[in-house]
Amino acid sequence: MARYIGPKCKLSRREGTDLQLKSGVKPFDVKTKKANKAPGQHGQARGGKQSEYSLQLREKQKVRRIYGVLERQFSNYYKEAARVKGATGENLLKLLESRLDNVVYRMGFGSTRAEARQLVSHRSITLNGRRVNIASIQVKSGDVIAVHEGAKQQLRIKNAIELAAQRGIPAWIEVDHSKLEGTFKAAPDRSDLPAEINESLIVELYSK
């Protein structure tokens, strides 16, 4: 399954919520005037009762799109989350949040996860002093992530840091923006993660 490269707001409208796919801190309804309409020429205002399966599938698609993960990757993350000790849904979110591209985004080096993923693929990011280009690397407690010396003057990184200052840096990450360097202190607790995600629906979907 190929990665989606079309209009970002269309995906957010499809899920009925802001997936944080576009840079900026404006509310979703300000980013797009069609916020409460499904995409398509004949998109109608949202309404009507959805089936249980439809709700579960939509939640999975929403989370998959938030983190920019393909279907097979997402399925593998779920299997790993179910294998280890703890609540499967919470484990799944921790695995997604621990991806290198997500951590780069959370540290404020990329204005979106897609931009953070591009920084990694272009070898503009170092992990514990070594340049890497695999966005899906699982970052561990104590790992140090930094912008490579050759990329520190990129305007998009400076712009991303300004946006991050408005958005806020999570407590489970420590960042020194003057050095363009940060430390992944620990995987986040569920209380640190987005409340609008209902991971129990995803667990119900995969449990069938």
Swiss-Prot record:
Keyword Acyltransferase applies: no
A GO cellular component annotation in the UniProt record: small ribosomal subunit
UniProt-listed CDD domains: S4 (cd00165)
Domain S4 RNA-binding per the UniProt entry, residue ranges: 98-160
Stretches the record annotates as Disordered: 24-52
SUPFAM superfamilies, sorted: Alpha-L RNA-binding motif (SSF55174)
Alphabetical keyword list: Ribonucleoprotein, Ribosomal protein, RNA-binding, rRNA-binding
Gene3D superfamilies: Ribosomal Protein S4 Delta 41, Chain A, domain 1, RNA-binding S4 domain
Domain of life the protein comes from: Bacteria
An example Gene Ontology biological process: translation
Gene Ontology molecular function terms on file: rRNA binding; structural constituent of ribosome
Subunit (UniProt): Part of the 30S ribosomal subunit. Contacts protein S5. The interaction surface between S4 and S5 is involved in control of translational fidelity.
Function comment: One of the primary rRNA binding proteins, it binds directly to 16S rRNA where it nucleates assembly of the body of the 30S subunit. With S5 and S12 plays an important role in translational accuracy.
Family: Belongs to the universal ribosomal protein uS4 family.
Protein name from the UniProt record: Small ribosomal subunit protein uS4
Species in which this protein is naturally found: Acinetobacter baumannii (strain ACICU)
Gene that this polypeptide is encoded by: rpsD
